[in-house]
A protein has these predicted regions:
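Conserved SAM-binding strand-loop segment of SAM-dependent methyltransferases
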Residues: 9-15
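Short, catalytically relevant binding-site loops at active-site mouths
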Residues: 1, 18-19, 38-40
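ADP-ribose/adenylate-binding Rossmann-like module
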Residues: 30, 35-38, 46-73
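Adenosine-phosphate binding glycine-rich loop
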Residues: 61-135
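NAD(P)-binding Rossmann-fold cofactor-contacting core
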Residues: 1-7
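Short amphipathic alpha-helix with an adjacent loop that forms part of the alpha/beta core around
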Residues: 17-27
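Short, conserved active-site loop motifs that form the nucleotide-linked donor/cofactor pocket
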Residues: 9, 29, 87
């Protein structure tokens, strides 16, 4: 509601699945699934996969156990391994943080790397400077 989120550009009502179904998703979309529970995450993911498009990025927050459980359930429901391999989950680059702002930074860095078709490697490893040959 507007009182709780006064600065929100848009407030959407409905189930997670209905909301995702009504959103326009295409090959240029970047999607992050962050809900209040395992079942909602799965329903969002199913709604995205059911659209039969390949967004540039689908990421889902979750522990290794939650992700494995969700993937197993989706495989049992008929979704393919190929579909699930396109999902970035757990999301973000490995920066070993539990701070929300730093986790968000790791997620955005991963999305940027995907957008730019890069790996997220350290620049010092990509553009090596040979210190031994400076003299």
């Amino acid at each position: 509601n507007r009182k709780r989120f006064p600065e929100a550009a848009e407030i959407i009502f409905g189930t997670m699945k209905e909301t995702v179904k009504n959103y326009s998703i295409d090959e240029n979309s970047y999607i992050i699934i962050v809900t209040r529970g395992h079942e909602n995450d799965k329903e969002c993911l199913k709604a995205i996969l059911d659209k039969k498009v390949s967004p540039k990025y689908i990421g889902m927050v979750g522990s290794r156990g939650k992700v494995l459980s969700t993937y197993k359930e989706l495989l049992d429901e008929g979704y393919s391994e190929e579909e699930l391999k396109k999902i970035y989950s757990p999301i973000g680059l490995d920066i070993s943080s539990s701070e929300p702002k730093e986790i968000a930074l790791g997620i955005m860095a991963e999305i940027t790397a995907v957008k730019n078709q890069k790996t997220g490697e350290h620049m010092r490893d990509v553009r090596k400077i040979d210190i031994d040959n400076l003299n």
